[in-house]
Amino acid sequence: MAALRMRIQLNGESFELPDGETVAALLARLDLAGRRVAVELNLDIVPRSQHADTTLNDGDNVEVVHAIGGG
């Protein structure tokens, strides 16, 4: 039996994930785990301390912004 899938909007693009994926798992999938990022879920900022406990749902809008050093 195939795993159920959901679609979210990630930085304005359609993105498919397994049902029940957390913000932390999404960041790991994007190779952003442990990096300095800001995550917005449906217009609300998700604190880093809540990434592992915040489950994504079908149709969610997620924006991920990561800091890039410069100077």
Where are these regions (language model features)?
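Ubiquitin-like/PB1-type beta-grasp interaction modules and other compact soluble beta-rich domains
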Residues: 1-70
